[in-house]
């Protein structure tokens, strides 16, 4: 249902602002992969913002592996990349060669230029500070936004409950999921 909600939001006239809540291993990342793929099919770039370098690389591997059979270019940006690699990624992002970029705070830096950003995915929003969120607000005026969290902060949850933000709750694990 969360995937259907996101798809419907992305096809509506107003920009999506949806919170997807679900326990660890319930499929939030899969919802994000599908949303980013839909954005790429619509010739829009997607940015996946994560709080740590390790998570950036894990998500990069997941997105890359899930989309390897499609003409979608996935890359990542974090402090683990060399200056040369970072420069190349930033150039490719600006020229539109990268469809899906996954990264840490580096994604909201002044030197990041987008070709046509259409979707912003924020994983674990509660781990980002106020200044990061302010930069995100400036970045996402006409961009679909998907926030994923297993433990949303009260303010985020309140916005969803008030109706200022849409919310999908993943209550059941995917079939064949092994317990963690």
Predicted features along the sequence, with ranges:
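P-loop (Walker A) phosphate-binding loop of NTP-binding proteins
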Residues: 23, 51, 150
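Post-Walker A helix-loop "phosphate-sensing" segment adjacent to the P-loop in P-loop NTPases
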Residues: 39-47, 68-69, 142-144, 165-169
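Conserved helix-turn-beta segment of the N-terminal RecA-like "Helicase ATP-binding" lobe
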Residues: 55-94
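Post-DEXD/H (motif II) to motif III coupling segment of the RecA-like Helicase ATP-binding lobe
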Residues: 57, 114-119, 124-180
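Conserved motor-coupling elements within RecA-like helicase/translocase cores
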Residues: 80-101, 109-117
